[in-house]
Amino acid sequence: GRRNILELAHEAGMRQACYGVESGSPQVLKLIDKSGQTVEKMEIAIRETRRVMGYADCSFMIGSPGETADSVRETVELCQRVGLQPEGFFFTTAYPATAFWHLALERGLIRKAVTGVAGPANDDIMEQYFLRLGEQGDSVRTNFSDLPDEEIVRLSWEAISQLGAQNVFRHPHTGETQRRGVIRGATHADV
C-alpha cells in the first residue's frame, strides 16, 4: 500500500509539522480564501500529525474578515475535538504583498494602526506601520472583523483560557519554550 507521507518524513528526521489552520470556522476560512482547506481536512491532518510525531504545531488567527464570537467558538471546538492545546493565538495582521495587506490598505487599517483613525496610507504612514509591527500576538493592528479591537482581545484570552493554552511558544529546533508578552486587554493604541 501507499506509505503515509508523515511517517516517511518522520523516518527521514522531520520532527515538526506546522499548520496555519487560522480558524475552525468554515465561513472565516472561505472569506480568507484558504484555497480548499476545510475544517474536516485540518482535523485529519492534525490527528495524523499527532499520531506520527506526538505533536502538531498549529497557528490560529483572531480578527479575520467575518470573525465573530461564534467563529472563535468554532475554533475552540475544533481544538477540543482533536485534543489540541495550541501554543497561543495570533491577531490577524497585514503584511506587505499579501491579500490582507491590500485589504488593509483598501479599508484604511494601516493608517488606523498608526494614528487611530482609518484612512489612506502614504509612505510615512506605511513606514511607521512597519516599524511598529512587532509580533502578531502582542496587539491588534489590523482588525478585519466588525468587532471592536477590545472584543478581539477578550475573545483571544477567552479561547486561550478555555483551551488551557499558555501563550507559550516552542522553538521548532530546540524545543525550548518562551512565554509570549501579550498584555491582557492591550490594543493597538497601547503599543
Predicted regions and their residues:
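C-terminal non-catalytic accessory extensions
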Residues: 173-191
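A structural motif corresponding to the C-terminal lobe/cap of the Radical SAM core domain
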Residues: 1-178
